[in-house]
């Protein structure tokens, strides 16, 4: 099973991946994990990946373009069929049942 993690904070993952139960699965070659920095797909010189919300309001949102381009580049890296899961506040809660469905 392969996981490609798309993130703005790739430096957060090596410690976790090398110390957890996931590390044992990686060492036993049951799982592969690749971490991808979404900023690599940003188009401007500052590698900006966030923007103000459409229609105004407080806070920032992640631009869709770098995320889509990253997905389009990462999915073909593995010949196996891919399931793409995008995490959003409005989505379904990722629970054990969903994880088991995705593992099939």
Protein language model regions, located:
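S-adenosyl-L-methionine/SAH cofactor-binding core of RNA-modifying enzymes
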Residues: 63-104
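N-terminal nucleotide/polyanion-binding subdomain common to many enzyme families
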Residues: 1-77
């Amino acid at each position: 099973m392969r996981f490609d993690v798309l993130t703005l904070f790739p430096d957060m993952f090596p410690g976790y991946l090398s110390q957890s139960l996931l590390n044992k699965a990686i060492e036993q070659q049951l799982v592969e994990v690749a971490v991808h920095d979404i900023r690599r797909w940003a188009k401007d010189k500052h590698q900006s990946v966030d923007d103000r919300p459409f229609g105004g309001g407080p806070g920032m949102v992640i631009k869709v373009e770098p995320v889509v381009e990253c997905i389009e580049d990462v999915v073909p890296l593995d010949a196996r069929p891919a399931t793409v899961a995008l995490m959003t506040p409005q989505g379904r809660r990722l629970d054990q049942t969903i994880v088991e469905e995705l593992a099939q």
